[in-house]
Structures are given as C-alpha cells and as structure tokens.
Amino acid sequence: MCFWTNLSVWMILLSHSLSLVSSTETGKTLTQNNSRAGSQGLLEVLRVLSAGDHWSLNHPQSLIKILLERTGCPQRTDWTQGDCKLCLEADALLLTAGGNLEDELREEVVQRVSLLLLYYIIHQEEICSSKLNMSNREYEFYLHSLLGLRQDEDSYFLSEKETDDILAFTRKYFGTSSSQCMETKILQRESGIQGSNGADEKTLPQLAATIIALSLQGVCLGRKALPSPDDFTEYIFSFLNSTNTLHLSEIEQLLNMLTTRRTCAKEDKYLHQYQRKQNTEEHSLRDPKTSTAMDKESDDHSPSWDQACFSARQLVEIFLQNHSSLSISKEDFKQLSPGIIQQLLSCSCQMPKDQQAKPPPTTLEKYGYSTVAVTLLTLGSMLGTALVLFHSCEENYSLILQLFVGLAVGTLSGDALLHLIPQVLGLHKQEAEFGHFHESQSPIWKLLGLLGGIHGFFLIEKCFILLVSPNTKGLPLVNEHVGHTHHLGLNPELNDQSSGGKSISTIQLKGPEDSQTTVLPIGNVPASNRNGKTISLLAIMILVGDSLHNFADGLVIGTAFSSSLESGVTTTIAILCHEIPHEMGDFAVLLSSGLSVRTAILMNFLSALTAFAGLYIGLSVSADPRVQDWILTVTAGMFLYLSLVGMLPEMTHVQTQRPWMTFLLQNVGLVLGWFSLLLLAVYEQNIKI
C-alpha cells in the first residue's frame, strides 16, 4: 500500500513538472489557467503530500504546517520519524498572509504564504536566531522587502536580476540539482509575468508560489545546466583533429598554442562577449544585493558553453562534485586540467586589449623617460628665467606671470585630485579591470565637480573684490608662490623711466612683516655688488631652498614613472607648469640681491640639476608598489597645499593695473590646467609611449 501511495505521489509530481518545463518560449498570451499554475500547482503538491490524511485536506492550518515542514526542513528524507524543528509557526504564518484558521485555504492565501516563505529562506539566519520576528510585521512589509531586494533596481518591480538572486537562495536552500534547470524567463512566463520590468505587487505572489512548488519537486530554477567534464575533453579533441585519438605531433601543437597563445588571435570575435564572473555564487548567497554568478543571457538565445568563461568555483563544481573545501589537491588538479586547457584554447576568459591592465614599465623605460622628463623640467625652469629678462614692459610681464600662476594652480590641483588620489585609492586599477567607461569614470566626474566648487568660490571672491572694493590695495603680485623656498615676498614693479635713453626697471621686495617697500633697480645695481666675489645671504638661501625643491620634484617624478608611464607624464606636466612661475620669482630675487644675470642663470641651472639626484633616488626606492603609493600620497598633499594654500590666495588678492584682464588670464590658466589633466585622467589608458 505504501509503495502504491508513494508511486502515485511521484507520478503526480512528475506530470506537473513536465507540464511546466515543456512550455514553449513563444510570445502567445498565457491563459488565466496558466497564470494561476503556480498556486494551483502548490495546492496540488500539498494535497499529494497529505495523501491519506483527509482531515488535513479540510484544515488550512494543517496544510500550511505540512508546507512549512517541507520548506523548513528540505534536506530531511524520512518524514515518518521525529519532528522538524521550525523557526516559524503555521498559525502566525497563515494569519500574516490574511488567511483564516477555519476557512478553506484559498489560492490567494497560498500565494501570500509562498511569498513569506521566500522571505524566510533569504533571512533564515536572522529569523532562527530570534533577531527577526516575522509575526510582528504586516504582509505588505515582506512584499515590498522582496520588491526592493536590490537598491539599484526599481522598487516597484522584481527585476530579472532580483529574481536570479532569489533563485540562487532557493537552489542553495533546497539543494536542487544543477542539471535540467528551468530558465528565469520561462519561470516568469509560467507565473503570468508579461512585462519586461518583472513581477509587480500582483504577480510576485504567483511567482513565489511557482518557485516553492517547483523547488519542493526538486526542479532546478534560474540557471542553465553546466557542461559535463567529458564535454571539455571533447572540445580539446575536436579543436585539434576532430577524432577520438591524438598523435604526438598534435600534442606538440597544443603545447605550442598554449605557449605562444596564437589561438587567441583566431577567437577575437568572442573576446567582447564574455568576461570572468567576478562574484561567485557563494558570495551571492551571502548578499542578495549583489549580482549572482550567472550569465546575462540575451532575449532570444544564450551562447554555447564552449565559449563561456567559467570561474574557478564553477570548474570545481563541474569536475569535483560535492567538493566543499577551498583547497585543491594534486589528484583534484588532474581532474581539473581538461577544463583549464579548454579555457585557454577557447580564449573566452581573455579580456579585450583595450581593457587589459598595462604591465609596469621596464627598467629602461623608467630611467629613459624620467630622464627626458627631468631634462625638460630643467629647460622649463630656464624658460622661467628668460621671461624675467623681458622686464622692459611691466604690464605684459604681470599678465604673463598671472597666466602661468593660474596654469600652475590648475595643473597641480588637477594632478592631485584627478590622477594621484584615484591612483593611490586603486580606482585606475578597477577601470583597467572592468573597462566600463561611464561606471569606472564616475569618481573622476565627482572629483571634477570638487574642482568646480573650488573654481566657483574663487570666482565669487574675486568678483566681490573687483566689484565691491576696486580701490582696495591687494597683496603683492607674487607673494607666497615664490616664497616657498625663502621667506621674502616679491612684487615686481617694472617702472619704465627715461634716463639717457635707457629703460630702468625696478623690483620691489616686501617681507611679510614689513609694510615698507625697498626699491632695488636691476639696471643700477652697484658694480661692487654685482661683480664682487661674495654672495649675499639672500642668494644662498634661495640657492639652497631651490635645490631642495628641485630635489623633491625629481623624487616625485621618479616615483611617478616607476608606477606607470601615464602617471609620470601627468606629474611632469603639473610640475613643469608650476616650475615656470616659481623660477621667474626666484630669478628676479637673485638679480635684486646683487648678482649678475650670468651668475644668476648659472646658480639657477645648478640648483635645477639636483632634480636628477632626486630622480634616481626616487627610481631606486620606489621599486616596491607600497612605497610608490605612500610617496604619491604625500605628493598629492604637497600639490594641494602649494596650489590651494600657497598660490590660489595670491591670485585672489593680486594687485595689478589691469584687474579684469588679469582675472581673465587667471581663469584661462585654471581651466586650461584642469582640462588638460582631465583629458589625461580619462584617456590615460590609451596613451602609448
């Protein structure tokens, strides 16, 4: 009798399962009976499970208890002995779903109970540990909790990704087989879900009933069947000669292919279709808000598995069934070898070239390109000294200086915020790994907005000074900018005075605590001072400070080129734009201290050579990536301080004869510096040197 009862149960379950799986994927409208298949199927399963117990058929509380036992203890095989320890009560579950303990069990109540069971499956640990009591909430709370499973999805619909997350939980919970799985879209159609948005408040309970009914029958849901181990071996043999045997020459050919990777050139059309899954199913089961380790399939068809990129966990699942350990033994590796070889031959896991992370620069590249960069930096400092020699026109000198000061602020702050900080935080590595432009560039746009806030407040303050108090005396022309290597501020006032047909230029030196100005004519410096053998203390201070500054610049450039060629290029541009106005101020102070033009140029050149010493020290100490990150972190802070604390206030309070033209050139320099660093930050992966 028991045999025939069990046989009838399994025949009914099998017929119901086949009726669901055999449904076609055509676009025909589902009938009302099909849309209600989930709840009716679950009721049918409950009636079969309670066969022989006529009392339970007429009491909804007993049916819900049977459903709760089967759902709460899915791995239990012997249902005739012992009790199942449940974390839910059938009465509370039925009342929360809007049912009655005495009335007949309605389909709507069955669907709601199924939805509550899905919530229980997802949050079983919290519920069973008494951290979450389901009887304290209304049914609508659980409904909206499932609809809002992912924060990045529409909270009014259960999207396909959210459905995949739920099905991943149910597969793990019920321990269903990974073969002959029903696809998510077929499951949605069986539940009466017509739209592309997914299930809503009305259709989600039907979907929940279908999921519970099929899971109780052991049907795998939401994931296509993985290939068998023999399929990988078949692929390898078919790839080489399409027979059941391999010759030694073909084994040699296989080794050559794996060594040279020539086979990947033949499969370039597949490289853009697949990527290795970043989140394994185990991770997805722990966090429903993240995506599961499932292939994103097209609406019409899914790709063949032989061009699919399998994760390490999936290969273990295919070749080593019931393998729960994270370690792989030698015997296990022997079984995994065909899968690894097949993945290498198919090239399905190789990323496109434009998304591959670039290798670190070689020793020759680091030393070669960085030496060229420091050489250009030295020549750029000489350009700054050359601009001071054109002091005959005070107005043009002031405008050129402010243009370069704005350019220095833009490049220094832009390099720190758009390049160095994202690099030390690892954002560039994520961009190279995933290759999604809009997603990976999101931090860059946010940091650009930060620069926009800085520029906006600079405009407000500058306009306030120009419009409200145009006659207020500002700070000297170049104050802190040229003073970070010494303690003197510099205000070049280039006054053209007619004296025997000669133009006399003067430079005003102004200390931070001195309110009086000392006028030192460049052209009328006493010969005893200009040709004397002694060098003033001011010149020595400038020489030492400038040497240390250039040494630090070389150290930073060496570290940047050790990290990547792109980082070296951006850092060199930022330092070069900063160095030109800096050297203009230092050279002017050297001339005013009594040195001749030739001596001042020589001293400026000698101090610039210390950058090479810093360069080669930086290249040697920054071989370790951790050292690189720390040096670049300090460099970003130094750049922000120099640009925002030292030079931007000077731009705000500069005193000039043409304030609006100065204001325009300052903004041109700022925008040009930020825009150039933005282009480098966005397209640095495409830079080829």
From Swiss-Prot:
GO biological process, one term: regulation of neuron projection development
Topology relative to the membrane: Multi-pass membrane protein
Compositional bias ranges of the Basic and acidic residues kind: 278-303
Positions on the Cytoplasmic side per record topology: 223-369, 419-447, 558-600, 651-662
Catalytic activity reported: Zn(2+)(in) = Zn(2+)(out)
Annotated glycosylation sites: N6, N133
Keywords: Glycoprotein, Membrane, Transmembrane, Transmembrane helix
Topological domains, Extracellular: 1-201, 391-397, 469-536, 622-629, 684-689
The keyword Cell membrane appears for this protein: no
Tissues where this protein is expressed: Highly expressed in brain, namely in the hippocampus, frontal cortex, striatum, hypothalamus, and cerebellum (at protein level). Also expressed in neurons in the Purkinje cell layer of the cerebellum, medulla oblongata, and the frontal cortex. Abundantly expressed in the testis, namely in the spermatogonia and spermatids within the seminiferous tubules.
One GO CC term on file: perinuclear region of cytoplasm
Source organism, top-level taxon: Eukaryota
Position of sequence motif XEXPHE-motif: 578-583
Subcellular location: Membrane
Transmembrane domains' residue ranges: 202-222, 370-390, 398-418, 448-468, 537-557, 601-621, 630-650, 663-683
Region (Disordered) location: 275-303
Stated role: Uniporter that promotes Zn(2+) import from the extracellular space to the cytoplasm across the cell membrane. The transport activity is temperature dependent. May play a role in neurulation and neurite extension. May play a key role in maintaining intracellular zinc content at levels that reduce the inhibitory effects of rises in oxidative stress on spermatogonia and spermatozoa viability during spermatogenesis.
The protein's name: Zinc transporter ZIP12
Organism (species): Mus musculus (Mouse)
